[in-house]
Amino acid sequence: MLGCHSCHDPHGSARIDSTNSVVYPQIGTTFPPIVDSGSYGTVPAAGEAVGVYRLLAWDGYQATGMTDTFDGVPAAIVPSTYNREESATPTRTAYGYGATDGFESWGLWCATCHEGMHETSAGSPSGVVHKTDDVLNGIATNYNAYVKTGDLTGVATASYTSLVPFSTSANGTDIATLAALAVNDGSVADGPANGDRMNCLSCHRAHASGWKYALRWNNEAEFLTLGPPATPVYPGVDAGMGNQGQFNQGYTTAQMEAAYNDRPAGLEFAGHQRVLCNKCHLKD
């Protein structure tokens, strides 16, 4: 049975040292002490270390009752105030890409348990619905141009949305690099570079999604909002649209807004906003 301990090690001793390498204490070795959490951007000085992000499972970790073993830790930094509404500005979790020095990419880390969903390159096997950890290349251009349905005037310096995050590749395990991106005031809104990567969390939440399959948006219908392009509305059951259940999944207008981290419908969406697969794929 899955539990919190399936992904998090409550007594984990893995740590990140001042060279941005993951260190695993072993008998007969010396290693730097942990001086702070590894989740919020503290950069350890020489001879010090911080914990790994969210005490996530590390190389060799196997939870009680599980048969799969993790091969490293993924990289990320989050603002110190993270569990908040996003009615005005997004909470930007800075995900990083790493595959050396004790790190593992987000896609491979998640695939420890979700093997059937993972793919790293084209030519997906039967049943696999999306590749992950791939370099974005031209998809980054799409992401940066996409503002909302009917608007492709975006610029790379203002294109980020926390509804479709991505992994930073350049210095992707460097704490200082990720900490500079992890803001909640909208001051860093840069979208991806061509070398950055999508990951499982680009489309899914790890916890507490309001939508099926732990997705970040309602993917059960073609529209996230209804109404005219300039005045979108969430089609809640209390908005006179209760007969259009595919759009609201039985939620009220307030519940739909809450499922999007308290975003007003007009903050990032157009009327008849299509699903956010289009942030990368431009098919709307």
Positions of PLM-derived features:
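A motif-centric signal for short, conserved binding hotspots located
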Residues: 1-284
